[in-house]
Swiss-Prot record:
One of its GO terms (molecular function) is tRNA binding. InterPro entries: aa-tRNA-synt_IIb (IPR002314), aa-tRNA-synth_II (IPR006195), aa-tRNA-synth_II/BPL/LPL (IPR045864), Anticodon-bd (IPR004154), Anticodon-bd_dom_sf (IPR036621), Beta-grasp_dom_sf (IPR012675), TGS (IPR004095), TGS-like (IPR012676). The keyword Transcription regulation does not apply. Residues 243-534 are annotated as: Catalytic. It is found in: Cytoplasm. It comes from Hamiltonella defensa subsp. Acyrthosiphon pisum (strain 5AT). This is Threonine--tRNA ligase. Coiled coil: none annotated. NCBIfam families: thrS. SUPFAM superfamilies: Class II aaRS ABD-related, Class II aaRS and biotin synthetases, TGS-like, ThrRS/AlaRS common domain. PANTHER family: THREONINE--TRNA LIGASE, CHLOROPLASTIC_MITOCHONDRIAL 2, THREONINE-TRNA LIGASE. Its cofactor is Zn(2+).
Length: 638
């Protein structure tokens, strides 16, 4: 006789087992109509699942946060339903939910074209608008295997054989004649799956292994209502306009080519942006009293075996042979910094020792995962490592956080999510050390008034960490900064200092990154600003243009004066119409366009326009230069 407790604290007593949907109907018919699933004793379950014991129940409706993930999962099944109707010989692999949508991997005879994708989406809409009931059946492992064997679904059989214990009872979901397998929950009927859009296809290896067959991956998005779907599609359209790969090409920032996949060819304009970021970071390094060092980009495999990287990370490392020795191109800077720390005896008086590097790192990312500047093989880390005593941890972490926020605010990022990851089951170090370390990190965050999300068990085996995630103008999340405590690496590489009692002690090592990868951060900034870099970052800060040839000498003179002041100024003396030149440089997103005609020459002035097309009027060269230099030195965002 289940007693069901509802979110408002009220209880309902029932004489027999009943489904989530039955409870919703008992409360109100309208609630039953909008019931997608249930949360019973903190576990999501299907609307058709029976409740036979006492517990707390929340009816999940489209307005609840959990609903959209259930809808997306069911849309993946809907995609499978439509695929099997259009191309019956297709074998279905996996169809999980991902951020903002879902995908399904298909073993299909011919690659899907854009026309195929449109046809598939149309069929999905036709099926969804039938509002048919989705039937769930919990069956034996053998029954599930027999079902998919009869249908020739070899990938589903592989999942059963390799991932599901033969004593388990898998869930089968019936979409009319189509059958799929899933943990669930799923929608009770297809009336909840009307707001979706198929987006693209790509290749994907079965099980993510390049030795396996390449499948067709179809991506889609799905939402609870039309308003949410339209808003997301509008954000996607805006993201396309802001795509750093497109802007990088139009602004001549960088390029990639087949001979060096995932490695950036920086052009002059892009390298200027890169160097400006380095200058900013170097200023902060000086302010926070760091040493800047430079380690080798390649070291003997023996060292990486000592650190544990070879055992856990070798497949992501590039290697090379020379004189019968195997070398690894470094994927990270930390071992090199430890080796520098070990040179010369260190005393407790030398600590904290803060060591920073713009380290050139390489990681052997899968070619299919490479994506412009956002996912590369060769990148530069604004990496630092702090060696300190346990008593110094709190102060050093506090300074790391302050430095991180200082830099993020320079770029105008206001929404920053912070996560604190604590001890995992498998770890090194005593519980006492972990407790102290976790308390130190949490206390520092609280002292600075920073709200954070606790992630129990998500820390690395060698120490807890703080992660900083930036949200851009399109509300996309970019995980950039980290502050990570490390109890392991100094022990592995025999690093020590002499304490006040003349005894050896192992230092605490703090890994600290703010931008993460400079390449990736430039990609993020390019999209955040849509290529309209603030003046201090802009590759070309000022473009001077003449109206006729008569003003050429004056334009050159003004440009030279600005260049001598450190301004990145260029001239355009082409024999083109003034409107054409203004439009072109506006498209290049140059912050200031200075127009010089006879009037400006006579008055020793310049007519100033912004990259948005706004006419600021005429200024004397000196007044404009003072204003511009103030914008640059203050790193003004506007």
């Amino acid at each position: 006789m289940p007693v069901i407790t509802l979110p408002d604290g009220s209880t309902r007593h029932y004489e027999q087992s009943l489904s989530v949907l039955d409870v919703a109907l008992d409360i109100h018919p309208r609630l039953a109509k909008s019931c997608i699933a249930g949360r019973f004793n903190d576990q999501l379950i299907d609307a058709c699942d029976l409740l036979s014991v006492d517990g707390k129940l929340q009816i999940i409706t489209p307005s609840d946060g959990e609903a959209v993930e259930i809808i997306r999962h069911s849309c993946a099944h809907l995609l499978g339903h439509a695929v099997k109707q259009l191309w019956p010989e297709t074998k279905m692999a996996i169809g999980p939910v991902i951020e903002n949508g879902f995908y399904y991997d298909l073993d299909i005879e011919s690659p899907l074209t854009q026309e195929d994708l449109e046809l598939l989406e149309k069929r999905m809409h036709e099926l969804a608008h039938k509002n048919y009931t989705v039937i769930k059946k919990k069956v034996s492992w053998q029954k599930a295997r027999d079902t998919f064997s009869k249908r020739g679904e070899s990938y589903k059989i592989a999942i059963l054989d390799e991932n599901i214990d033969s004593s388990d009872q898998p869930n089968l979901y019936f979409h009319e004649e189509y059958i799929d397998m899933c943990r669930g929950p799923h929608v009770p009927n297809m009336s909840f799956c009307h707001y979706f859009k198929l987006q693209k296809t790509s290749g994907a290896y079965w099980r993510g292994d390049s030795k396996n067959k390449t499948l067709q991956r179809v991506y889609g998005t799905a939402w609870s209502d039309k308003k949410q779907l339209d808003a997301y599609l509008n954000r996607l359209e805006e993201a396309t306009k802001r795509d750093h790969r497109k802007i990088g090409k139009t602004q001549d920032l960088y390029h990639f080519q087949e001979e060096a996949p995932g490695m950036v060819f920086w052009h002059e304009n892009g390298w200027i942006v890169f160097r400006e970021l380095e200058i900013l970071i170097r200023e902060k390094l000086k302010e926070y009293e760091y040493q800047e060092v430079k380690g080798p980009f390649m070291m003997d495999r023996v060292l990486w075996e000592k650190t544990g990287h070879w055992e856990n990370y070798s497949e992501n490392m590039f290697t090379t042979l020379s004189e019968n020795r195997e070398y690894c191109i470094k994927p990270m800077n930390c071992p090199g910094h430890l080796e520098i720390f070990k040179q010369g005896l260190k005393s407790y008086r030398d600590l904290p020792l803060r060591m920073a590097e713009f380290g050139s790192c390489h990681r052997n990312e899968p070619s299919g995962a490479l994506h412009g500047l956002m996912r590369v093989r060769g990148f530069t880390q604004d990496d630092a490592h702090i060696f300190c005593t346990e008593k110094q941890v709190r102060k050093e972490v506090s300074n790391c956080i302050k430095m991180t926020y200082d830099i993020y605010q320079t770029f105008g990022f206001k929404k920053i999510a912070v996560k604190l990851s604590t001890r995992p089951e498998k770890r090194i170090g005593s519980d006492e050390i972990w407790t102290q370390a976790e308390e130190d990190l949490a206390s520092v965050l609280k002292e600075q008034g920073i709200t954070f999300e606790l992630q129990p068990g998500e820390g690395a085996f060698y120490g807890p960490k703080i992660e900083f995630t930036l949200y851009d103008c399109l509300d996309r999340a970019w995980q950039c900064g980290t502050v990570q405590l490390d109890f392991s690496l100094p022990v592995r590489l025999n690093a020590f200092y002499i304490d006040e009692n003349s005894e050896r002690q192992v230092p605490v090592m703090i890994h600290r990154a703010i931008l993460g990868s400079i390449e990736r951060f430039i990609g993020i900034l390019t999209e955040e600003y849509a290529g309209f870099f603030p003046v201090w970052l802009a590759p070309v800060q000022v473009m001077l243009i003449n109206i006729t040839e008569k003003q050429s000498d004056y334009v050159k003179k003004v440009a030279k004066n600005l260049q001598q002041l450190g301004v990145r100024a260029k001239v355009d003396l082409r024999n083109e119409k003034i409107g054409f030149k203004i439009r072109q440089h506006t498209l290049y997103r140059i912050p200031y366009i200075l127009v010089c005609g006879d009037k400006e020459v006579e008055s020793n002035q310049i007519a100033v326009r912004t990259h948005s097309g706004k006419d600021l009027g005429s200024f004397s060269v000196n007044v404009f230069a003072d204003k511009l230099l103030e914008e640059i030195s203050s790193r003004c965002l506007h």
